[in-house]
């Protein structure tokens, strides 16, 4: 049984069958860069980061493209408000976006194309649409004639008749029909502009993604993703202009993330009910934010509450405590010559939970269900460590290997597992613990306390239990 994805286009789950064997080509709509990213944006990019990570974990080569819309009405408006050059404004917020995604441990896309660097490609694409009879020039720009594309509405279910009643269409003086949308906007005074066969101007919003995705992923590719709010009009219009140009199916699977909700309303800039990524990172670690997002399936609405974030923080601490318990137990572990009933119980619990994890992720990347399996392993291994005098090294390693998979797929615990010289570090820590133990015996408590304090600064906490001392890693605040 392979990976199943929910395809917005067909409104059902389908087995993922990439166009090229062993490779998934994926395009995710990137930001319009005029302001700081908020949690609603982060939710989408964390979700697609985990989807990509899981596909790579399952052995696929993933080619991922994410665009930057660096010229747009919103950018021009913000630049006019601030007196900043639109290009410099966009450049500044591209840097902000990349910094925020890096802080959230979102892996970089393979290619980040920008609209302003693909103007010639966009012009060529529009020329093809005109040649094929799908586009026309009006007084204020070039438009796509929606009624010429017979499959319009197949993604969103919207009907042309409804659009003609004035629902969710952009204004335009030169349109033939209300539903038609701009491919090229003729220049207005003071706006950025480029030469074209239709006079100076700039691209419309929808044409950008069709051009840039196809340039790097081909005229047909596997996955196109974004937030639910992009289904109409953006993705619907992308399909229309792309399939009109190429004459065949453009994208095989359409994936969309649910909204982040605040007291029953969508988190958005327009409502002013948003919290920026930077504000969140002042209060919570990147891993807490990732875990908060992953506690819900990517297609489900995600309620933003402080209680929810605190719950994620507590859960993350539980998992880190489990990792430390395993590490400490490894010191006392023994090789397996014979298994007891409790050994078998622990092994079976890990095996069953591991299967549940993969089953959940194979079922449209259901991170909420997969996390339940993670906590099943956590509970089982903690119980095992408490109940046996000498845990079996092989069982502890199986639990640790499972958590490494979780780290790889969910983007948590990465620093914990990245320490290449961990073995040497542990030997040095053990040596310092022994030196401190001797100092305490000699009642040289000032030096013993100095070692404890210096180790604490490095994230190593010592706990004295009678004559013995146990150490564990902690987050340095």
Curated annotation (Swiss-Prot):
<feature type="short sequence motif" description="'HIGH' region">
    <location>
        <begin position="31"/>
        <end position="41"/>
    </location>
</feature>
<dbReference type="InterPro" id="IPR014729">
    <property type="entry name" value="Rossmann-like_a/b/a_fold"/>
</dbReference>
<keyword id="KW-0648">Protein biosynthesis</keyword>
<dbReference type="Pfam" id="PF01406">
    <property type="entry name" value="tRNA-synt_1e"/>
</dbReference>
<dbReference type="GO" id="GO:0005524">
    <property type="term" value="F:ATP binding"/>
</dbReference>
<comment type="similarity">
    <text>Belongs to the class-I aminoacyl-tRNA synthetase family.</text>
</comment>
<keyword id="KW-0862">Zinc</keyword>
<dbReference type="GO" id="GO:0004817">
    <property type="term" value="F:cysteine-tRNA ligase activity"/>
</dbReference>
<feature type="short sequence motif" description="'KMSKS' region">
    <location>
        <begin position="266"/>
        <end position="270"/>
    </location>
</feature>
<keyword id="KW-0030">Aminoacyl-tRNA synthetase</keyword>
<keyword id="KW-0067">ATP-binding</keyword>
<keyword id="KW-0436">Ligase</keyword>
<feature type="binding site">
    <location>
        <position position="209"/>
    </location>
    <ligand>
        <name>Zn(2+)</name>
    </ligand>
</feature>
<protein>
    <recommendedName>
        <fullName>Cysteine--tRNA ligase</fullName>
        <ecNumber>6.1.1.16</ecNumber>
    </recommendedName>
</protein>
<feature type="binding site">
    <location>
        <position position="29"/>
    </location>
    <ligand>
        <name>Zn(2+)</name>
    </ligand>
</feature>
<dbReference type="GO" id="GO:0008270">
    <property type="term" value="F:zinc ion binding"/>
</dbReference>
<dbReference type="GO" id="GO:0005737">
    <property type="term" value="C:cytoplasm"/>
</dbReference>
<feature type="binding site">
    <location>
        <position position="269"/>
    </location>
    <ligand>
        <name>ATP</name>
    </ligand>
</feature>
<dbReference type="InterPro" id="IPR015273">
    <property type="entry name" value="Cys-tRNA-synt_Ia_DALR"/>
</dbReference>
<dbReference type="InterPro" id="IPR032678">
    <property type="entry name" value="tRNA-synt_1_cat_dom"/>
</dbReference>
<dbReference type="GO" id="GO:0006423">
    <property type="term" value="P:cysteinyl-tRNA aminoacylation"/>
</dbReference>
<dbReference type="InterPro" id="IPR009080">
    <property type="entry name" value="tRNAsynth_Ia_anticodon-bd"/>
</dbReference>
<feature type="binding site">
    <location>
        <position position="234"/>
    </location>
    <ligand>
        <name>Zn(2+)</name>
    </ligand>
</feature>
<keyword id="KW-0963">Cytoplasm</keyword>
<feature type="binding site">
    <location>
        <position position="238"/>
    </location>
    <ligand>
        <name>Zn(2+)</name>
    </ligand>
</feature>
<dbReference type="Pfam" id="PF09190">
    <property type="entry name" value="DALR_2"/>
</dbReference>
<dbReference type="InterPro" id="IPR024909">
    <property type="entry name" value="Cys-tRNA/MSH_ligase"/>
</dbReference>
<dbReference type="InterPro" id="IPR015803">
    <property type="entry name" value="Cys-tRNA-ligase"/>
</dbReference>
<keyword id="KW-0547">Nucleotide-binding</keyword>
<keyword id="KW-0479">Metal-binding</keyword>
């Amino acid at each position: 049984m392979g990976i199943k994805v929910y395809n917005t286009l067909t409104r059902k789950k389908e087995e993922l069958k990439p166009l090229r064997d062993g490779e998934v080509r994926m395009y995710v709509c990137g930001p319009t860069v005029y302001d700081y990213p908020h949690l609603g944006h982060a939710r989408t990019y964390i979700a697609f980061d985990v989807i990509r990570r899981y596909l790579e974990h399952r052995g696929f080569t993933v080619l991922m493209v994410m665009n930057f819309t660096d010229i747009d009405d919103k950018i021009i408006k913000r630049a006019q408000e601030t007196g900043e050059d639109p290009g410099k404004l966009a450049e500044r917020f591209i840097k902000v976006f990349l910094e925020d995604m890096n802080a959230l441990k979102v892996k970089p896309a393979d290619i980040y194309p920008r609209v302003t660097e693909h103007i010639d490609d966009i012009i060529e694409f529009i020329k093809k649409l005109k040649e094929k009879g799908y586009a026309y020039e009006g007084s204020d720009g070039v438009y796509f004639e929606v009624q010429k594309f017979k499959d319009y509405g197949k993604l969103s279910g919207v009907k042309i008749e409804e659009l003609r009643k004035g629902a969710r269409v952009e204004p335009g003086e030169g349109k033939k029909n209300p539903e038609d949308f701009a491919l090229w906007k003729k220049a207005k005074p003071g706006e950025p502009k480029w030469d074209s066969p239709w006079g100076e101007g700039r691209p419309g919003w929808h044409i950008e993604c069709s051009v840039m995705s196809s340039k790097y992923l081909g005229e047909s590719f596997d996955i196109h993703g974004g937030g639910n709010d992009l289904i109409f009009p953006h993705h619907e219009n992308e399909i229309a202009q792309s399939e009109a140009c190429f004459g065949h199916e453009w994208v095989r699977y359409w994936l969309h993330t649910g909204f982040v909700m605040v007291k029953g309303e969508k988190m958005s800039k327009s409502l002013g009910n948003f919290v920026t990524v930077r504000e969140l990172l002042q209060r919570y670690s990147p891993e807490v934010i990732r875990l908060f997002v992953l506690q819900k399936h990517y297609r489900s609405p995600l309620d933003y509450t402080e209680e929810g974030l605190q719950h994620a923080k507590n859960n993350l601490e539980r998992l880190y405590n489990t990792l430390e318990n395993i590490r400490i137990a490894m010191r006392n572990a023994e090789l397996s010559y014979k298994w007891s009933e409790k050994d078998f119980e622990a092994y079976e619990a890990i095996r069953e939970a591991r299967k549940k994890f993969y089953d959940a992720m194979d079922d449209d990347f259901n991170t909420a269900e997969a996390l339940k399996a993670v906590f099943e392993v956590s509970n089982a291994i903690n119980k095992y460590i408490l109940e046996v005098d000498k845990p079996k090294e092989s069982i502890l390693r199986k639990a640790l290997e499972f958590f490494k998979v979780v780290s790889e797929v969910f983007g948590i615990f990465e620093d914990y597992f990245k320490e290449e010289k961990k073995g040497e570090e542990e030997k040095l820590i053990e040596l310092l613990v022994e030196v401190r133990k001797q100092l305490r015996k000699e009642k040289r408590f000032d030096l013993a306390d100095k070692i404890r304090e210096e180790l604490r600064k490095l994230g190593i906490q010592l706990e004295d239990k009678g004559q013995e001392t146990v150490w564990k890693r902690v987050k340095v605040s």
